[in-house]
C-alpha cells in the first residue's frame, strides 16, 4: 500500500506540472502541414499517413478532434534505435479525448525503452471522451526500468473506449518486479475494451495481465468493461497475475486467455485477483503456476460487500503450485465472495503441498460474504481431485456428455455447444457481415465475430466512399427498410448480437452541395443567392444579377477566381459534382480610347488602354514657336494628366498645353558699336534698335544671315527662334588733299577708310628739298604711306627744307677766296676781293663770260 500511495502522489505531481500544457492544447484548427488533410471533424477527420502525422496528434488532445489513418505507418526510421523510443501521446494531466480510427491499418516499428516513468504506451492516458478503434499495433519491445506504473502497449490508462485493436510486441513487454498495473494492451482500464486482442508476452511486477493490468471499478460512474477480447501471450509477474487481467473489477464477458501464466500470489489463467467482478462466458486454456491462490481461471475472488459472479465460464489448463501452502483450484484458487454458476474446470492440477486444493475451487471461504457454487463441475480424472461442496466432480466421459450439463440447466441454445468426445465450449459467436454496394473507393469493414448477447458497436465508415453520397449508417435491409444503426450516434451505434449471423448494409444519402456566387472584386450590387443542389442535378447558370465592377464588363462565371477553371455563360448548365462549387464572376477589363488634341501641334496618335491602367506618355508633339507643357484632362487646361499615377477610366481626350517661346535676338554689329540683345515672343516683331556706329563705315541695316543677303524688315519680319541679326556696313570713301606749301600742285585722291594711299610724285619747290607729307600743318606728324591708313577726309601737308648752296669764288688767276655756304634766296656777304698781280679786281660775275654782275647787296642766291 505504501508503494501505491507513492505512485498516486507522483501522478498528482505530474498533473500539476503539466496543467499549463492542457490550456494551450484545447480544440483548435491544425495547420495544413501537420496532417495529410482533413479538418479534424467527425465528417472530415485529420488524415494520418506518416509517423510525423501520428506524432502530431499529441498537440491535438482535446475533445472533438477526429483522426483517421489512411495507410500503414512504420515508425522504424522515425524512432532512434538507441533512444527511448516512442513518447506516449498525452499523460494524466493532458488526456487524449479525441477519436482515432485506425481504419484497419497497422502501426509498425513501435518500441519503448525508458529508464522510468508512468503512463506508458502509444498513448499515455485515453480520457473519458476518447475512442481508439480499428487499429493494429506491432513492435519490437517495451521495457521500462525502475518502478513504473500504468504501462500498456496502447495506453497506460484508459477511461474511454477501445474497439477492435490488436497488439503484437515481438519481444514482449518486460518490466521490473517493482512495476505495477502492467497490461499487454492497457495498464489500467476504467473504460471499455471491445473486440480487442494481444499476442505478446508480458512480464512485470504486481497487477500484470496479458490484456489489462487492472480492470477498475469504483462502484459509481466508471466500470471497467472487457468484452469479446483475448490475450494469447505468456504472462509472468509477482502478485495478481492473470492471463487476461491481473486485478479485475467490473465486467468481463466473452473473453479468453491462452498463454501460460506464472506468478507468486493470486495467479489465474484469466484473472489474477478480483473483487466486484462479473465474469460471463469467458475461459482460459492457460497453464498456470503460482505459490498462493492459484486458479485455472481466477486466482482469488476477494471479500467485498458487493458480490462477484462467474457464469458460463471454464478453464482447461494445467494448474501448478510447486511450494507448500496456499490454495489451488481448477477454476478458482480462493473464493471469498464469488457466485459460481454453470462453469467447469478440466485441467491437470499439481499441488501436492497446497493447503487447500479443489478440482473446481481450492478454498471456498465461509462467513457473511462466502462464495457459492451452482451447477458447476470439474473433471475428476484430469484434475486428480474428488472434493465436493465446492463443485461437482465428474468423470471425463460425463464431462463430455451433453446431458450432464443439460440436466443441470445449462443453455445449449444460446451459450453452450458440445461436440462428441469433447468438453462443452461456448457456442456464442456469430458473424457480423458488412456489405456496401456501389463503392467508388475504400474497403468494406471486415467480417466480425461476436458472442451471442454481446453489445456490438457497429463499424464506422472507415475509408469507404461513394461519389456524391454521404455515409448515413447501416441497415439490416438493403433498401433501408430494416433496423438502422449510426456509428456516430451515442444512442444508435450498437445492438445486442443475437443467435444468428447478421448482415448490415451500408446506407447512403445523396449529397447536396452549395453553388456559391462570388462577385470577384466587384464594386457594387449583389451576387445571385447561393443555391443548394443535389449531386448530379443540373445547375442553371444565372446572369450577373446586380453585380457591377467599375471599368469592367461581366462575361460569365468561372470555377476559378483567375478564370483558369471551367467557364460558364449565363444560361449554360452543368451537372453538380461532389464538392461545393464557387462560381466567380468573370470580368473583362474595358478598353478605352485616349485621343490627343495637340491644339495646333503635330498630330499624336490615339492609344487604347485598359481601365485602371496608366498609359505611356507619347512623344511630345511639336508646335513652332511653342514649348510643350504637358497633357491636360480638360479643354481649359486646369487639370494635368500624370502619366505615372493617373489611370484611364473612360474614353477621353487629353489636351496639349503650350507655352509660347520667348527668344533672344542678338545683334552682331560686325565691328560696330555694341547693340544690346532683346527678348521677343515667337511671331512678334521687334523694335529697331539705335543703329550702331563703326569708324569709317556707314551702317546699311540689319541682316538675318552672316552673308548679309537677307535684310531684316523690322516692320514685317517676326521672330521664330533664337537668332542673331548681322549689321551691314558700307566702307566710307574719303578725299585726301595735298597741300604742297608752295610747291608744285599735287592732285587730291579718293580712298576707302583704313586703306593705304599711294604716295604721289613729290611736288617741287624752287630752292627747296621735299621732305615728305605731314598730317598737320605744323608738320609734326609725318604720314607713312606704307603703314598709315585713311580714316577720314584729310589734307596732307608738304614739308620743305630750304636748300643750302655752296658759293665758290673763281678768282680767275687771282688770290684764293674761300667758298661760302648760303641758303637759297639769301644774300651773301661780299668777300675780301682777291688780288691778282698786275690786275685790278673789278667785281664778281655770275657767269664765266662776266656779263652779269653779282650784286651782293641785292642779288639773292637762287642757283649755283
Curated annotation (Swiss-Prot):
Region (Disordered): 372-399
Transmembrane segments annotated in the record for this chain: 7-27
Membrane disposition: Single-pass membrane protein
Superkingdom in the source lineage: Bacteria
Chief place where the protein resides: membrane
Keywords per UniProt: Cell membrane, Membrane, Transmembrane, Transmembrane helix
GO cellular component, as recorded: plasma membrane
Compositional bias segments (type: Polar residues): 383-395
Family annotation (Gene3D superfamilies): 2.160.20.110, Listeria-Bacteroides repeat domain
Compartment annotation: Cell membrane
The protein's name in its UniProt record: Putative Gly-rich membrane protein Bcell_0380
